Amino acid sequence: MANIKSQKKRILTNEKARLRNNAVKSELKTAVRAVNQAVEAGNKETAGEALVHASRKLDKAVSKGVIHSNQAANRKSAISKKVSALKG
């Protein structure tokens, strides 16, 4: 157990950040999964809407510092490639 006051404070803030990060990452997985399911089902409209929703979630995660901007760009690129292949 930490003895120094600042260490005790960091333990609390790190735990809060960990919980928030896990929640945001879970939302990201759900959003990306929705895009993939729509693509597999062949539903163009739903896939497009889910793509916009997932892109927004990814951008928000970057702004919160949960994931790196390059990782968000890679994920957005991958799902948009699937959706555009469905439309094309």
Curated annotation (Swiss-Prot):
Keyword Ribosomal protein: yes
Gene3D superfamilies with a match to the protein in the record: Ribosomal protein S20
GO MF terms, alphabetically ordered: small ribosomal subunit rRNA binding; structural constituent of ribosome
Superkingdom of source: Bacteria
Pfam families: Ribosomal_S20p
Protein's UniProt keywords contain Phosphoprotein: no
Record keywords: Ribonucleoprotein, Ribosomal protein, RNA-binding, rRNA-binding
GO process terms (BP): translation
Cellular component GO terms held in the UniProt record: cytosol; small ribosomal subunit
SUPFAM superfamilies named in the record: Ribosomal protein S20 (SSF46992)
Family: Belongs to the bacterial ribosomal protein bS20 family.
Functional note: Binds directly to 16S ribosomal RNA.
Official protein name in the record: Small ribosomal subunit protein bS20
Organism of origin: Renibacterium salmoninarum (strain ATCC 33209 / DSM 20767 / JCM 11484 / NBRC 15589 / NCIMB 2235)
Phylogenetic placement of the source organism: Bacteria, Bacillati, Actinomycetota, Actinomycetes, Micrococcales
